[in-house]
Amino acid sequence: MVKSDGFVIGRRGALRVLGGMAAGLGVGASVQAQTTGGGGLGSSALQAVGRLFSRPQGNLLIVGGGDTPLSVQQRFVALAGGPENARIAVLPMASSQSDEEAQEVVRDLEGLGARAQVVEIRPTDVNSTAVAQTLEKFSGFWFSGGDQSRLSSLLVGTRALQAIEARYQAGAVVGGTSAGASVMSRLMLTGKWRTPRNSDEEEQVNIARGMKELAPGFGFFKGAIVDQHFMHRARYNRLISAVLDHPQLIGVGIDEETALLVRADGQWEVLGNYYVKIFDARRAQIVDDRGPMAKAADIRMHVLPEGGLFDPRRRRVEFQEVNIP
């Protein structure tokens, strides 16, 4: 087992900018720039961290898209009560054409011994007592892929979502893939640009504050912003841009065929075939401007394969040996 306590934390205060780059990253004439973020955490900040990373009774398992590995499906069923006991709702509302995918998920879960069924919640039923009572019977909830904005606009603030959250707080497992992963945070990336730049090329590569549109998500994954298909679609720019706008939140980039399990004990565990990348700017030095190019220093990045653990409270990483057949 290998442990990492992170890197050196920069001092609080103004960040010196040298030729347009942070001190230590370039050379040239210096000017002063205001920064956000900063050094050590005071008592109020520590209390805020405690609220952001408070522990629910349930587990959250989110996949970065692509094929969901069998080991991840097995873990989901186990967390929902195990074979014969797990009763799982498959919720396909992120897509208007997801019935076939949802039925495939049901077949996969049933093949692992769970009782699973598709639960399609219509806009007219989101505050229905009958729907809420139906949802209360499940021990697991799985959100399929599509467009996270469809899920957010349909369910946020509704009785249906409150019923799912109540089950989560009582010990149920909530999961999803692709859009069903992004929607789990309190603030979610919509995939849209808030401030388009001058060229398509610049939009693809820039890291800048104020660029990405965020919208309310479900709020099950507190203290984080999630992006999916991360390595396969080269989404570093949009997740880092969002983290610079909200440095109190940890950026979580999940690759395809890979999952992050947010455990009831507060630990984050990586499952699957590729990586979860974590961007932690809670103690970073960030230049407070909205120019076309971001300026920041001391952002921690962790690259975690299967078996990797992250403790968001203590900012610690552990790597565990994984047996590969």
What is the meaning of each model-derived region?
Residues 134, 157-171:
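Catalytic-core regions built around general acid/base machinery
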Residues 144-145, 168-188:
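Catalytic nucleophile loop
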Residues 39-84, 99-111, 188-190, 194-325:
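C-terminal and late-domain segments of enzyme folds
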Residues 1-10, 17-23:
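N-terminal secretory signal peptides
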Residues 148-157:
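Glycine/threonine-rich flexible loop motifs
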Residues 31-33:
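Boundary at the C-terminal end of the N-terminal hydrophobic targeting segment
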